[in-house]
């Protein structure tokens, strides 16, 4: 990609290959001898991070696809079975799901770095446009991937976003029908999205090759925005840039691992742990955080077609940036006004993301319209105007001259600002997903909380007893097999105890030789049976409300923590919104409805349930279940024990996740330290 190479391998076999297919020379000229500006800072490391993350997403995605079932009736269950029954399936899913967010985080940093340092200017226009194409492909891939788990937010997100194409005149309805494969989102839609989600990453990889090719033709930009003029301005890509990139990737992996092992659901949505239900619309349909700024632009424009045009224009306009900004000076380091407006633009994007997570009503709509105007004004008014009126500061004559005055404090402060802004952004997302119209649940001290938390075996066994004697008459545990009770990290029953426990249940099986269905005693390999044969029977027995399956209830329920707790949650690894909520609801029943509160007939008042009206009668009362270990037979103890058990049913491999996370963190810290000191040694003679 860097041009002809005179590299010749010393090995005779490799020489034979090189004469016929000079692939080794191409690799040497592109990734070893390639001259790299010596003043590149760590913002340039995100290119290597993105390459690593793309490879990681493709690898984990291919393995997950081996076990995934793209069928509307089986997709949700297949994902859960991957997590529970495939060896390290929980790790693969966490890597892939959290990896999508990390991929977008890295690409946003990469794009903002290009904006700040003018990496879109001549001669890098094609390089920049290819980057925008990659970003568009990433957005399409991420959206289709989010649909695949077939949870509530997946289904309704697909419905809302695909419906946008109906705004296109003449062809819109036909496009929507083609995407759906029918007249509503369903199984054909899921199959289409799975196929495209599998294909697009390889297309992204192909465009990345073109992107890297264009980079090697035009050369890398640098913080000063001046082209290398002599050998003193550059260093060989390997080992200098390679080692620096490896250190940067190692540091990024620490953040990545933080989410994988300790905060896997921090960036997700509780509603997506509920199977897709076309008959129940979520209170807030909110896309993933990396789409929120554009979602805010879409919703801020009242006309549907204009909103769609505005949303796509907000991305496409990036392709025209090389011609909108005609300033001769590339880097904003030497453009005081451009630097100020750049940070204003970053603030506008963050605020748009905040608004995208809020309900489309009142002041949020007005603010969205103002910020949408600001977003487009930056590209269409500010940049063209600045290129004509701004007087830049003197630019260094060469890269080597600029290195003498280099400092790192600004980079550190910008990094801190980005982390703080990102925390605020993610916190706004949690606020939007709060349970409205109810008191916030009180916190609890859970044994499984924190990086070294473990399940209390006694609480798990007591919780199972409460479930069996109280909850099992209405609620199933369809994702838990009896054998799971004997697995490490669970209630710690012996194989014999599990067999005896399973035999108490009657399992419908068959057909037998006569073609009839029959009942038999349960076996360890069987799953907990549902108390009802189907959903219609469940509704008929419960006044029209279908009791939810409890396997995932502590993940499928949550509440917004609000400011500033969501910031602290990231650092304290607080992930117990679900258990706190479930425990609070079990204890939140009150016989007397407060004055001024009206609930429908046949409902019960619960101060923690959204809207306070719940169809489920009070399930627990003091003395209802007898414990053999002397634990108090109170509602508070029952609720805490059964919630602990339900947290285990939601994630049986939690202890393994945290244990492996500690080992990975130790390795990454040591690896990052080795890379840092190696980098110091390699670069010692280059400054």
UniProtKB/Swiss-Prot annotation:
Name the record gives this protein: Cytochrome b/c1
Residues of the Cytochrome c domain: 458-643
Subunit organization: The main subunits of complex b-c1 are: cytochrome b, cytochrome c1 and the Rieske protein.
GO molecular function, one term: heme binding
Cofactor, how bound (note): Binds 2 heme b groups non-covalently. Heme 1 (or bL or b562) is low-potential and absorbs at about 562 nm, and heme 2 (or bH or b566) is high-potential and absorbs at about 566 nm. Binds 1 heme c group covalently. Heme 3 is covalently bound to cytochrome c1.
Membrane association type: Multi-pass membrane protein
Annotated signal peptide: none
Function: Component of the ubiquinol-cytochrome c reductase complex (complex III or cytochrome b-c1 complex), which is a respiratory chain that generates an electrochemical potential coupled to ATP synthesis. c1 functions as an electron donor to cytochrome c.
Disulfide bonds: none
Requisite cofactors: heme b; heme c
Entry binding sites for heme c: 471, 474-475, 616
Sites where the protein binds heme b b562: 96, 197
Assigned protein family: Belongs to the cytochrome b family.
Binding site for heme b b566: 110, 211
Organism: Bradyrhizobium diazoefficiens (strain JCM 10833 / BCRC 13528 / IAM 13628 / NBRC 14792 / USDA 110)
PROSITE patterns from the UniProt entry: CYTB_CTER, CYTB_NTER, CYTC
């Amino acid at each position: 990609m860097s041009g002809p190479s005179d590299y010749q391998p010393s090995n005779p076999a490799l020489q034979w290959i090189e004469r016929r297919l000079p692939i080794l020379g191409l690799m040497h000229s592109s990734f070893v001898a390639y001259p790299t500006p010596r003043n590149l800072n760590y913002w340039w490391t995100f290119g290597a991070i993105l390459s690593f993350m793309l490879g990681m997403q493709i690898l984990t995605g291919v393995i997950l696809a081996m076990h995934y079932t793209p069928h509307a009736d089986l997709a949700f269950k297949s994902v859960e079975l991957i997590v529970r029954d495939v060896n390290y399936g929980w790790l693969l899913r966490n890597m892939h799901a959290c990896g999508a967010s990390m991929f977008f985080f890295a690409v946003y940093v990469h794009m903002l770095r290009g904006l700040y340092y003018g990496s879109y200017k001549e001669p890098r226009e094609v390089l920049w446009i290819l980057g925008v194409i990659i970003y568009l492909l990433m957005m399409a891939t991420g959206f289709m991937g989010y649909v695949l788990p077939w949870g509530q937010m997946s289904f309704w997100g697909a419905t809302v976003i695909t419906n946008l194409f109906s705004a296109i005149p003449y062809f819109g309805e036909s496009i929507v029908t083609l995407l759906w494969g029918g007249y509503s989102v369903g199984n054909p839609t899921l199959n289409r999205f799975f196929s495209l989600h599998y294909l697009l990453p390889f297309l992204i990889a192909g465009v990345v090759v073109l992107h890297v090719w264009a980079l090697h033709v035009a050369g890398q930009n640098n913080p000063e925005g001046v082209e290398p003029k002599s050998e003193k301005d550059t260093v060989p890509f390997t080992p200098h840039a390679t080692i620096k990139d490896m250190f940067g990737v190692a540091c990024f992996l620490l953040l990545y691992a933080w989410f994988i092992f300790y905060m896997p659901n921090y960036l997700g949505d509780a509603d997506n742990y509920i199977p897709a239900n076309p008959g129940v619309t979520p209170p807030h349909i909110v896309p993933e955080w990396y789409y929120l700024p554009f979602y805010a632009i879409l919703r801020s424009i009242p006309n549907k077609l204009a909103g769609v045009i505005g949303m796509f224009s907000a991305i496409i306009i990036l392709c025209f940036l090389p011609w909108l900004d005609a300033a001769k000076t590339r880097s904003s380091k030497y453009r005081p006004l451009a630097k100020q407006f750049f940070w204003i633009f970053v603030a506008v994007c963050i605020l748009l993301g905040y608004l995208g997570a809020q309900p489309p009503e009142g002041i949020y709509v007005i603010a969205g319209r103002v910020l949408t105007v600001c977003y487009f004004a930056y590209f269409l008014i500010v940049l063209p105007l600045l290129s004509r009126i701004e007087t830049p500061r003197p630019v260094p004559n060469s890269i080597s001259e600029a290195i003498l005055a280099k400092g790192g404090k600004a980079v550190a402060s910008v990094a801190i600002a980005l982390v703080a802004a990102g925390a605020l952004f993610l916190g706004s997302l949690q606020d939007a997903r709060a349970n409205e119209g109810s008191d916030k649940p009180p916190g609890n001290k859970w044994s499984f909380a924190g990086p070294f938390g473990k399940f209390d075996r006694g609480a798990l066994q007591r919780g199972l007893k409460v479930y069996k004697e109280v909850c099992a008459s209405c609620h199933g545990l369809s994702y838990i097999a009896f054998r799971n009770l004997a697995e490490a990290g669970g209630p710690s029953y012996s194989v014999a105890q599990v067999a005896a426990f399973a035999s108490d249940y009657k399992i419908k099986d068959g057909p037998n030789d006569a073609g009839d269905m029959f009942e038999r005693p349960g076996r360890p390999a069987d799953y907990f049976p549902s108390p009802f044969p189907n959903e219609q029977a469940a509704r008929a027995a419960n006044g029209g409300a279908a009791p939810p399956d409890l396997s995932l209830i502590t993940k499928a329920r949550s509440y917004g923590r609000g400011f500033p707790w969501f910031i602290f949650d990231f650092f304290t690894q607080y992930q117990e919104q679900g258990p706190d909520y479930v425990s609070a609801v079990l204890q939140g029943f009150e016989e007397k409805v407060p004055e001024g509160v009206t609930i429908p007939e046949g409902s019960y008042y619960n101060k923690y349930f959204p809207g306070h009206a719940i169809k489920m009668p009070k399930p627990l009362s003091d003395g209802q279940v007898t414990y053999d270990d002397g634990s108090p037979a109170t509602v508070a103890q029952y609720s805490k024990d059964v919630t602990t058990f339900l947290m285990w049913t939601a994630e049986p491999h939690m202890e393994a996740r945290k244990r492996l996370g500690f080992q990975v963190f130790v390795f990454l810290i040591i690896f990052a330290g080795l890379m840092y000191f190696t980098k110091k040694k390699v670069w010692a003679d280059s400054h």
